Amino acid sequence: MDGSHSAALKLQQLPPTSSSSAVSEASFSYKENLIGALLAIFGHLVVSIALNLQKYCHIRLAGSKDPRAYFKTKTWWLGLFLMLLGELGVFASYAFAPLSLIVPLSAVSVIASAIIGIIFIKEKWKPKDFLRRYVLSFVGCGLAVVGTYLLVTFAPNSHEKMTGENVTRHLVSWPFLLYMLVEIILFCLLLYFYKEKNANNIVVILLLVALLGSMTVVTVKAVAGMLVLSIQGNLQLDYPIFYVMFVCMVATAVYQAAFLSQASQMYDSSLIASVGYILSTTIAITAGAIFYLDFIGEDVLHICMFALGCLIAFLGVFLITRNRKKPIPFEPYISMDAMPGMQNMHDKGMTVQPELKASFSYGALENNDNISEIYAPATLPVMQEEHGSRSASGVPYRVLEHTKKE
């Protein structure tokens, strides 16, 4: 009897099994994923509100007689503060959740901009144009929300403390070095075709942006994770890898913004938003999976559902940006009959318009119809003076004297 009682006591004192510890680790990983996802959603939502506030400030100043500059208004400064707050939230989210989860959540900013643009900015629409124009946008918002839910639910649960040793080990690993070699070769080829061959296709430019952006998010996660550990008491700022990652983060972000600016000068913003989101998200998830090993240990079902969430979010963003209004470009128009004393350049009195092929130049004037002939610049006819010699120097134009009628 005593032997059986002692055996029961020993069984009660056994440590918890590995299955219970695995369940607790999975629960902790899901909580960290949820914290990171909420921070990212909050950050993107606040950034969208900030951008629309600043847009509202510019619209209000343009439509009023207020002589103040935009940076002297409280609305613009409130938008700037909210933008910094949102970017800080997105930056902090990388320290809690895997990179593969945070990157696709930028679809939240597209959803918020579509809704705020209609409500806050009061973008007007006619009832007859509602079905044609806005139904697809609302369907896109719904698909993007469904995709975001799938991303959060089936996101990878790989969590690793971003210590200096771990970041250095990932940086010199063979898979990432091979990935870096392929990315550098591809980036150089795209840059060559873009600069030397004038390959101004939007996919070429946004691929350059996406390749730089993948390095930006990899370095952002390392910097954010090391900063959070330092705040918690485990100082990581004395590792040189922290400063290497910080410099790479700033440099890639600056060049990424430069290429985005060039793309915005040639293509519509809605097209840039949809194509850029798809390319940047795909390449960034690939970089995160190689550098941080996000999908190691994940089962096939979770990976497939995560990929399905990405595809649904891609489709939602495409539908949202597909029907945005395209701005009408400014086309300068010159009517030669409006100039007093100037005869029409053409016999039938047709108006002429500047040639707008490469630059805003008035070097040649082109007829309005489809004639391909380009006329020379207009000049005033040279008139010889009646009372002077032909070789006399002076103004080669005849002066017309006007007298007032009493």
Swiss-Prot record:
Subcellular location: Membrane
Any one GO molecular function term: magnesium ion transmembrane transporter activity
Annotated membrane topology: Multi-pass membrane protein
A Pfam family of this chain: Mg_trans_NIPA
Residues where Phosphoserine is found: S372
Residue stretches spanning the membrane: 33-53, 76-96, 101-121, 135-155, 171-191, 202-222, 240-260, 271-291, 300-320
One record GO biological process: magnesium ion transport
Glycosylation sites: N166
Keywords per UniProt: Glycoprotein, Membrane, Phosphoprotein, Transmembrane, Transmembrane helix
GO cellular component terms attached to this protein's record: membrane
Family: Belongs to the NIPA family.
Protein's recorded name: NIPA-like protein 3
Originating organism: Homo sapiens
Lineage, highest ranks first: Eukaryota, Metazoa, Chordata, Craniata, Vertebrata
Gene (name only): NIPAL3
